[in-house]
């Protein structure tokens, strides 16, 4: 039996008002509405498609055997004005709508209906720069705006998601009891903490999604090495992934991959083998890669994961290339059990690289955009409810507890030891892919980053000499102080170069 004693706001002679208004009744919106209600809050809902809100409330009342829909504590409304009028002050309007122009459309409609101090929350996958703009715009009108990343899919929306709010901090004290109540919990801690000002919440969600792209591609590369390279059956794949999910690789994505390998189609054959090998994407991984380029951060693994999806989408072209550029058939003849372990090492090490690159990107963004991110709290928020929840997120939290100014997770003791332990197997797995002509773009790029990051000397001295040769871009010398720049007349036909002129 549900109870609603604490959060329903009423006064004598007044009708009962709602704690929160929710716009958007697609899959995520519906499940969030039920989650909010299940935690003792009354929620008013609105959907622009006529009849959807009424049908949702009526269906839920029927499913839950509630005779009077008023007792459902989910109130269907038929206009934005009715939605707003149903809310107590300060009003909280939570939008779960498609990112982009739709968000601005609803903001435009809500502004004249709201009063100073009211709050609009965008729970979609909005680009953080759009959230920056919306925070500033609404602040000028005396309204508060929160951009909140929500991860966890349909199940998380209903039973507890990872929630990453940022924007106008003045609004946090009002929405905190609701959002922390409905978020996932790990060890009694809510997977929802204030992230930072302006678009910080949506920025962190963007990086989360980039890491998600990386994790998924890494698993796919392990799958191809195991199935195509080692010839494992689906029953054997199931056993391998089930074992991995009981150890250091334990994570949501490994868990669901195990389930996928176990699932059979109507004819008893593995369903996954009947799915066309073309991957879709909604753009958040691409946003992460673009932002990394803008900040000058080597987000190599996530970039390769995005490109792998792009390549998969070129199915017809790949079919033509497969006929024109046939691979040499090579069979694996080594110790299969040892190679399975090596692939597991590669998956783990590359996964650590993905998180290290993601957190390094957030560190740079925090400085550039003045987000003041708390990386330990971010790791805590990702432990439950979300798609990238993994066992070692606790280790990330501990790393930042020890050193809040940690430059890169790879420098923490846990990561140092983990990488040293996995390195030999990681290299064997990449070599296997090379020998068998099986592409491993994320395994390989992660290894290249790892080797590059720990290289005291890289060949960029030659690169800078080339730049100076053809473009007079100057260079620094190792026998001179940093910050002093030189140009060489490499051909004897050049001219003078300064910081502001080029006459060579």
Where are these regions (language model features)?
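Small-residue-rich helix-loop
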Residues: 244, 366-399
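Interdomain hinge/lid region at the active-site interface
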Residues: 202, 227, 232, 239, ...
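C-terminal amphipathic alpha-helical interaction region
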Residues: 428-429, 434-504
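Glycine/threonine-rich flexible loop motifs
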Residues: 92-109
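Generic secondary-structure signature for well-ordered alpha-helical cores
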Residues: 34, 38-41, 61, 85, ...
């Amino acid at each position: 039996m549900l109870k609603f004693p604490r959060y329903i706001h009423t006064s004598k002679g007044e009708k009962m008002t709602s704690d929160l208004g929710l716009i958007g009744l697609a899959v995520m919106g519906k499940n969030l509405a039920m989650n909010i209600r299940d935690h003792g809050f009354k929620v008013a809902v609105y959907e622009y498609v006529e009849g959807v809100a009424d049908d949702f409330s009526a269906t839920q009342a029927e499913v839950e055997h509630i005779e009077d829909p008023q007792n459902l504590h989910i109130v269907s409304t038929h206009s934005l004005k009715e939605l707003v009028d149903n809310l107590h002050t300060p009003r909280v309007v939570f939008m779960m709508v498609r990112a982009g122009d739709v968000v601005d459309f609803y903001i435009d409609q809500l502004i004249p209906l709201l009063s100073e101090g009211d709050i609009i929350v965008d729970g979609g996958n909005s680009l953080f720069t759009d959230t920056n703009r919306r925070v500033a715009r609404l602040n000028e009108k005396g309204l508060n705006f929160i951009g909140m990343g929500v991860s966890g899919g349909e199940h998380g929306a209903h039973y507890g998601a990872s929630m990453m709010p940022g924007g106008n901090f003045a609004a946090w004290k009002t929405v905190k009891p609701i959002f922390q109540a409905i978020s996932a919990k790990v060890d009694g801690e809510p997977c929802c903490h204030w992230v930072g000002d302006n678009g910080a919440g949506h920025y962190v969600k963007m990086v989360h999604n980039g890491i998600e792209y990386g994790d998924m591609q890494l698993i796919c590369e392990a799958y191809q090495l195991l199935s195509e390279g080692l010839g494992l059956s689906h029953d054997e794949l199931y056993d391998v992934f089930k074992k991995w999910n009981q150890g250091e690789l334990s994570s949501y994505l490994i868990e669901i991959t195990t389930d996928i390998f176990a699932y059979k189609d109507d004819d008893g054959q593995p369903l996954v083998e009947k799915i066309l090998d073309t991957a879709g994407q909604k753009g958040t991984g691409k946003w992460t890669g673009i932002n990394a380029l803008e900040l000058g951060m080597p987000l190599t693994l996530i970039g390769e994961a995005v490109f792998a999806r792009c390549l998969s989408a070129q199915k017809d072209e790949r079919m033509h290339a497969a006929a024109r550029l046939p691979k040499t058939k090579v069979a694996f003849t080594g110790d299969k059990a040892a190679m399975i372990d090596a692939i597991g090492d590669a998956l783990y090490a590359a996964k650590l690289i993905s998180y290290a690159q993601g957190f390094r990107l957030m560190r740079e963004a925090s400085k550039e955009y003045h987000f003041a991110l708390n990386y330990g709290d971010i790791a805590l928020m990702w432990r439950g409810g979300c798609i990238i929840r993994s066992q070692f997120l606790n280790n990330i939290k501990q790393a930042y507890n020890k050193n809040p100014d940690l430059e890169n997770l790879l420098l923490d003791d846990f990561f140092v030891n983990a990488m040293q332990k996995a390195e030999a197997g990681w290299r064997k797995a990449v070599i296997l892919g090379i020998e068998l002509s099986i592409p491993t773009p994320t395994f390989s790029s992660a290894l290249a980053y790892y080797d590059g990051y720990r290289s005291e000397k890289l060949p960029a001295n030659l690169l800078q000499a080339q730049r100076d040769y053809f473009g007079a871009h100057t260079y620094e010398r190792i026998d001179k102080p940093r910050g002093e720049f030189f140009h060489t007349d490499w051909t004897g036909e050049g001219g003078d170069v300064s910081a502001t002129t080029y006459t060579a």
